[in-house]
Amino acid sequence: MVLITRRRAVTTLAAALAGAVAVPTYAQAAQAAQKHSGPTRPRPLRQAHAHNDYLHERPLHDALSHGFTSVEADVFLVDGELLVAHEPAELDPTRTLRSLYLDPLLARVKANHGRVYRGYHRPVQLLIDIKTNGVAAYLELDRQLRPYRRMLSSCTYGRVRLGAVTPVISGDRSARVPMEAQRVRYAFYDGRLEDLGSSAPAAFIPLISSNWTQSFSWLGTGPFPATEREKLHTTVSTAHRNGQRVRFWATPDVAGPARDAVWSELLAARVDHLNTDDLAGLERFLRARVQ
């Protein structure tokens, strides 16, 4: 879409301008966190998920300024570092998972009495999409998460402790093997529809994600077919009975009646995360409908 293309161009240009837009230091992140922790802070939106969040002008901060409670970052393992980008051509050594997400989140948690949003006691989800080399990338990610463990949700011998931030690992499926072998984890696994009803517990797979267009033909124009609506509601209710949340990607994301129609059906079915690149658009939609 044009929106995504424009953001990619901005990201690529920023990388090429040799520091014209500097990545915030921890101190700068702390200042930003303090600035946005005052009485004008937005009310958090439980269903708002920022797809490819790092393509926005201010990764993480733009989403949080709109009240989003889930953000997505794609990562590549390059020379022992986790770099955030959508494509290999966009890799920039200054745009790391730590600098764009972990450090700013920690700064906000410290500024807001242990939470990303002051007074909001649900975790904010950090969906980390490993693009390639899942095993090695996850092992490095696990190493990087540990210094931040006091703000992170964790699973110890199958028992979950919720923190201010819950990392969920998506993307390369091979990351599952080392994750399942761990007795102590600071991240969880993003399942697929085939994981519904499997032996994997919600303590390992708290989230079920799927490509909307692979399960549903309806894209918001005309009535929602009754069989597809029933399928959607059954999928969500099954996940919720298992203690799992649901997210669909590739839903319509061009502003207009079709997108609103799909989002309305997702809300009616109690889908947990609505996926968008349009932060302001989803915020307006949810604030008009969700109390």
Where are these regions (language model features)?
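Phosphate-group recognition and catalysis centered on beta-loop-alpha active-site segments
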Residues: 2-5, 9-15, 19-22, 27-291
